[in-house]
Swiss-Prot record:
CDD domains: AAA, RecA-like_ClpB_Hsp104-like. Residues 171-418 are annotated as: I. It holds the Pfam family AAA_2. Residues 425-460 form the UVR domain. Residues 823-848 are annotated as: Disordered. GO terms for cellular component: cytoplasm. Residues 479-670 are annotated as: II. Residues 80-144 are annotated as: Repeat 2. It comes from Mycobacterium leprae (strain TN). This is Probable ATP-dependent Clp protease ATP-binding subunit.
């Protein structure tokens, strides 16, 4: 039974126990419950007794006259008397008779009156209160109406505990009055939804089926339209048919919660409908309208939608619903009888310009909440960046969230103590530790000095904290576009500088940045840079991918490496590259692995290898390696990606590709690379060879791929073969990676020009490109160097120079060996040799 007690009813029981202790009584009787009811002071029972002139002091005096005080204060638990238990049982009956699912202070008072024979009833009679009159007073306060019929209608909820008459106790319990909230300025302003609000007013003014349902994507502002209607009602900006209406939002969760027995939910809903029908001025708003279908429908019961249908059809109940497009189709459209009773009102996603106006209208609320100043540039950045980079949500919700989190972030930063205060704390703690150590060592002079230092540090810290609190905290922090970009960077993983650095400066030096990793391939780097610049300059369809390229040419010339460099330039991380080996998708049925298996097939729940990666990292470079090895059906699926920037996976979800760069690599047309004519280290005819190879590659691509596929590609880039100078520069690049690993061991690696030339000669293969160079460096440099490190022939603190013996740089150099010389680095410490001190340890210079 006690689980049905309201918080105030539980407090009455606690106060009754306290009153019994004050009177030294070892029991809790009806008189103590009466004292607890009056002592509580805020419930319906206390208000009723107060209106009859019954005070706590008067009741306490009467109880002492009738019973007197006990001899000794009780200890431990104080039990209820049988009569007090009966009162609590009667309070449950009173609640059930009134149709309430809880026990409040009013029900306990009604139980006292109904019992009628205890000390509490005697006290009330002695104080001149007629028990019948007290009962009527409680019923009137509960219902807000006069007479028996009104009392029956006013079957209140916990609203009865408010202590003031109310005519909407059921609605107050299971809903919220939006017009009252609008009158108290608790609702955010609604900007630019005049058409939707006007359409809702038109539907509400119909004679029958006057029930609009707001349909739109999550976050576009469906609830805001209803709040705008509530504000219009308060301001009188509605037609005569809607004036003086009260707009309530119904919480279906509260209706269902606590309905333990069959019929409880239906009974609550019927009471809500009865109260709405009795008042006649209520418009009901049901958010997440689809929850009506099946709500409360236990075995043998009917759901909320079936209860509402008759009243909705006859116009007896005016209801505004709100739900998303998917849920409307899934739940409402399946129930044709329910669907025809609602009139759809589409709520579309606002434009970026409209979103900026919405943010300006909300600026005052967020500035007051976070105690910051939000600039116009921050609102423009929030709308534009959210629209560009957050693809799985909708405006204005995602832009508002950016503003909100940026304000919260700035406020938290200002409330965090500066680093120098923490440094003071560390110094003070250190001084105290040293002082205690000095005291333990009985070095009292040092302890006194440390005590003075501690006092000085404490005073300095107090002064710095005073400056911080009077300065930084009083200054209004400003949220600008940079703060918005930082928050967006935390959301999406895009490095902040990629958003805030001037795009023009970055794009103009794009070739320079790419060439830090790509040797040669001027045409390829320029073509990629130009395509990206066109995209970022806004001269490309924003719905298409940022760029789509076919990288063709011989193997080992840098096609994949350029893709990685492009990913690092655009998104700040090599991991932003999604690399897919198309050789794994050579059969028709393997295409499902790429985009997701259809329902009923193995792997349906796992999603596709491509679509899932892009959904998780929508800002990335996608590399389709060796595209010619894939099945033809995959090309057909990629047509939609190349044209519209989107793809539907096996689970029906739309994956957005508009922020990706698509790169297809191919070796078509390069089968003649093994022929000796015009290949290898080219001399004068290199350009003619390249044009001949480029023409053949293009011809082969046209034979292998359909025209509609090639027509959607931004650019086809044929890579050059590598020249001797480019191979030597590539040696520098690869050796620098080995040198960086040696730096960790405090060793420096240097190569002579002859050593580089020999590595280039041995590492380049006209068929395999530059990939064998990596193996050559591993075999000739890394393997030998690792042995010398293990034999301690070279070690930390040395400069290792790699050279070759007996080779003039012109011959084949097949028998020439590399030499490794370790020389100790020049010391940066004082020269001890002049003082006659020679350092020992470490290997002597070794030449092999």
């Amino acid at each position: 039974m006690f689980e049905r007690f309201t918080d105030r009813a539980r407090r009455v029981v606690v106060l009754a126990q306290e009153e019994a202790r004050m009177l030294n009584h070892n029991y809790i009787g009806t008189e103590h419950i009466l004292l607890g009811l009056i002592h509580e002071g805020e419930g319906v029972a206390a208000k009723s007794l107060d209106s009859l002139g019954i005070s706590l002091e008067a009741v306490r005096s009467q109880v002492e006259d009738i019973i007197g005080q006990g001899q000794q204060a009780p200890s431990g638990h104080i039990p209820f008397t049988p009569r007090a238990k009966k009162v609590l049982e009667l309070s449950l009956r009173e609640a059930l008779q009134l149709g309430h699912n809880y026990i409040g202070t009013e029900h306990i008072l009604l139980g006292l009156i109904r019992e009628g024979e205890g000390v509490a009833a005697q006290v009330l009679v002695k104080l001149g209160a007629e028990l019948t009159r007290v009962r009527q007073q409680v019923i009137q306060l509960l219902s807000g109406y006069q007479g028996k019929e009104a009392a029956e209608a006013g079957t209140g909820g916990r609203g009865g505990e408010s202590g003031s008459p109310s005519t909407s106790l059921v609605l107050d319990q299971f809903g919220r009055n939006l017009t009252a909230a609008a009158m108290e300025s608790k609702l955010d302003p609604v900007i630019g939804r005049e058409k939707e609000i006007e359409r809702v007013m038109q539907v509400l003014s119909r004679r029958t089926k006057n029930n609009p349902v707001l349909i739109g994507e999550p976050g576009v502002g469906k609830t805001a339209v209803v709040e705008g209607l509530a504000q219009a009602i308060v301001h009188g900006e509605v037609p005569e048919t809607l004036k003086d209406k009260q707009l309530y939002t119904l919480d279906l969760g509260s209706l269902v919660a606590g309905s333990r027995y069959r019929g409880d939910f239906e009974e609550r809903l019927k009471k809500v409908l009865k109260e709405i029908n009795t008042r006649g001025d209520i418009i009901l708003f049901i958010d997440e309208l689809h929850t009506l279908v099946g709500a409360g429908a236990a075995e043998g019961a009917i759901d909320a939608a079936s209860i509402l249908k008759p009243k909705l059809a006859r116009g007896e109940l005016q209801t505004i619903g709100a739900t998303t497009l998917d849920e409307y189709r899934k739940y409402i459209e399946k129930d044709a009888a329910l669907e025809r009773r609602f009139q759809p009102v589409q709520v579309g996603e606002p434009t970026v310009e409209h979103t900026i106006e919405i943010l300006k209208g909300l600026r005052d609320r967020y500035e007051a909440h976070h105690r910051v100043s939000i600039t116009d540039s921050a609102m423009v950045a929030a709308a534009t960046l959210a629209d560009r980079y957050i693809n799985d949500r909708f405006l204005p919700d995602k832009a508002i969230d950016l503003i909100d989190e940026a304000g919260a972030r700035m406020r938290i930063r200002r409330m965090t103590a500066p680093p120098d205060l923490r440094e003071f704390d560390e110094k003070i703690a250190e001084a105290r530790r040293e002082k205690e150590s000095a005291i333990d060592a009985q070095d009292f002079e040092k302890a006194a000095s440390l005590r003075d230092r501690e006092k000085q540090l404490v005073a300095q810290r107090a002064e710095r904290e005073k400056q911080w609190r009077s300065g930084d905290l009083d200054v209004i922090a400003e949220v600008d576009d940079e703060q918005i970009a930082e928050v967006l960077g935390n959301w999406t993983g895009i490095p902040v500088f990629k958003l805030t650095e001037a795009e023009t400066t970055r794009l103009l030096r794009m070739e320079e940045e790419l060439h830090k990793r790509i040797i040669g391939q001027e045409d390829a780097v320029k073509a990629v840079s130009k395509a990206i610049r066109r995209t970022r300059a806004g001269l490309k369809d924003p719905k298409r991918p940022s760029g789509s390229f076919i990288f063709a040419g011989p193997s080992g010339v840098g096609k994949t490496e350029l893709s990685k460099a492009l990913a690092n330039f655009l998104f700040g991380d090599d991991d932003a590259l999604i690399q897919i080996d198309m050789g794994e998708f050579h059969d028709r049925f393997t295409a499902s692995r790429l985009f997701g298996a259809p329902p009923g097939y193995v792997g349906y729940e796992e999603g596709g290898q491509l679509t899932e990666k892009v959904r998780r990292k929508p800002f990335s470079v996608v590399l389709f390696d060796e595209i010619e090895k894939a099945h033809q059906e995959i090309y057909n699926s990629l047509l939609q990606v190349l044209e519209d920037g989107r793809l539907t996976d096996g689970q029906g979800r739309t994956v957005d590709f508009k922020n990706t760069v698509l790169i297809f690599t191919s070796n078509l047309g390069t089968s003649d690379i093994s022929k000796p004519v015009g290949l290898g280290f080219t001399q004068g005819s290199g350009e003619n060879d390249y044009e001949r190879m480029k023409q053949k590659v293009n011809d082969e691509l046209k034979k292998h791929f359909r025209p509609e596929f090639l027509n959607r590609i931004d650019d086809i880039i044929v890579f050059h073969q590598l020249s001797r100078d480019e191979i030597i520069r590539m040696v520098d690049l690869m050796i620098s990676r080995v040198a960086n690993q040696l730096k960790v061991k405090d060793m420096t690696l240097e190569l002579t020009n002859k050593a580089k030339a020999l590595l280039a000669k041995r590492g380049f293969d006209p068929v395999l490109g530059a990939r064998p160079l990596r193996r050559t460096i591993q075999r000739e440099i890394e393997d030998q160097l690792s042995e010398k490190i293990l034999f301690e022939e070279v070690g930390p603190g040395q400069v290792v120079t790699v050279d070759v013996d007996n080779w003039d740089g012109e011959g084949p150099g097949e028998d020439v060996k590399f030499t490794f010389t370790g020389i100790r680095k020049p010391s940066t410490e004082p020269d001890l040799a002049k003082a006659g001190v020679h350092s020992a340890g470490g290997p002597e210079p070794v030449e092999q």
